[in-house]
Amino acid sequence: MSGVSNKTVSINGWYGMPIHLLREEGDFAQFMILTINELKIAIHGYLRNTPWYNMLKDYLFVIFCYKLISNFFYLLKVYGPVRLAVRTYEHSSRRLFRWLLDSPFLRGTVEKEVTKVKQSIEDELIRSDSQLMNFPQLPSNGIPQDDVIEELNKLNDLIPHTQWKEGKVSGAVYHGGDDLIHLQTIAYEKYCVANQLHPDVFPAVRKMESEVVSMVLRMFNAPSDTGCGTTTSGGTESLLLACLSAKMYALHHRGITEPEIIAPVTAHAGFDKAAYYFGMKLRHVELDPTTYQVDLGKVKKFINKNTILLVGSAPNFPHGIADDIEGLGKIAQKYKLPLHVDSCLGSFIVSFMEKAGYKNLPLLDFRVPGVTSISCDTHKYGFAPKGSSVIMYRNSDLRMHQYYVNPAWTGGLYGSPTLAGSRPGAIVVGCWATMVNMGENGYIESCQEIVGAAMKFKKYIQENIPDLNIMGNPRYSVISFSSKTLNIHELSDRLSKKGWHFNALQKPVALHMAFTRLSAHVVDEICDILRTTVQELKSESNSKPSPDGTSALYGVAGSVKTAGVADKLIVGFLDALYKLGPGEDTATK
């Protein structure tokens, strides 16, 4: 063969030689040289002979195929072939049924049924009385203060609240004591015109806000030299800011433009809202079926180059279970990722459990290496006025990335620490007054009462109501339960008709009770009413669930065949919040 020596191969000499002859020679190195050379020639010919617009089209097609294939293998790694096939089937089925229900053939029938349910929602939600005045528009002349106060009293009496004062509601009102409400009222009156946007005008509000943040940081064992945070309007804003900070930090430090969050399926819907608002992808991780904690092995599988934040709950809202924060912390450190702990619900319960005498507790705060941010609602078990929460960070660099700064605005130098511009100073003043009034001992006592009641309720179900199954091993203030023998949502409806309101859950179907200072005092009544209602439901096993109750609504939400209908019902509920009366729209008046 010309051009070939014992040690050297001439590429030109090999070009054109049949591949099968090369294989006969058995020289793999020479075969690879030929292959690479032919590839180079092919690429050169493509670049020389292909118009630029076709080249661009081909490039985009290759990128599309690459992303499609890489995403497929990513999901295959995360879920495995069987689970991925099931998820694909469920997703496709939902899309198909959503399309069918929105088709011209079925749209009219579906809308008719949806309208009926919307009407029942409005009838339940919109309440008034003939003795009340109505104000669809401003009165021509202002109403005297005494008359306004009288109307407020009428509204309170004629459109009564649910019996929250009697402890018959899960969560919602966490303290409710008259003395504390009186203190908060005085605080609000003194600072009702204060705005946190103007610290120069209201310097005392700035002082109190900084002290609220400092007190909460110490409760969660933040580093004394670097720990920091801000107050917010509630748990959802705290979660939004934690996600925003993680997104902007990853953008500036890692150049990530397609950010992803990894969170348990039980993480608060505020994380879904953050992903929706800020253009991020939320990867939901399934739970360990025994502990109901997030599956750490699956968390690792979800991590990729776009991951910007890991999430754990302490505890979660649905089941009252705290995720393995220490395990998540190790993963966060290994992959150099931020870890947010959502303790909005746990708040002043989990932070005082040790001092309240509870033993063998997992670490859930900044003592866990890897935890970079924590959210805590002061308006839950901190008993502050509604609209009060704190977002905490391990250091100021993380906090800085939640700020908005604009030095070029024509209205002057502009900056805001949270999502809102104006913020009601009276709320944070009420929070400050509540915290300093309660003191550490007051919160320890509340923790003992509330957790003690929750554990009593849990034990009662385990020992006296065999038809109910406690989910996981809740150790805090929330106890959830399911059933293999009863229609749980029908149980919820029956309890509601008796004046006792539990929270309805789904995936799996369950109920929970979030104990408060109010419900802790009536835990024996709660146990008794639950047991008797379960017995009634069992004795009427052939009865049908209410057609317009919780069973029907959650049945619609959970069925593949009614995909999209639940969305319309939720929108109907939200629309009803702003209607003057059933069938009336605020905008038409």
Curated annotation (Swiss-Prot):
InterPro entries: GrpII_AminoAcid_Decarb, PyrdxlP-dep_de-COase, PyrdxlP-dep_Trfase, PyrdxlP-dep_Trfase_major, PyrdxlP-dep_Trfase_small
Effect of disrupting the coding gene: Leads to the accumulation of endogenous phosphorylated sphingoid bases, and exhibits unregulated proliferation upon approach to stationary phase. Causes a reduction in total C15 and C17 phosphatidylcholine levels.
Protein name: Sphingosine-1-phosphate lyase
Species per Swiss-Prot/TrEMBL record: Saccharomyces cerevisiae (strain ATCC 204508 / S288c) (Baker's yeast)
Gene: DPL1
All ranges on the Lumenal side of the membrane: 1-58
Effect of residue 386 to A: Loss of enzyme activity
Transmembrane helix as UniProt keyword: yes
Effect listed in the UniProt record for changing residue 554 to F: Decreased enzyme activity
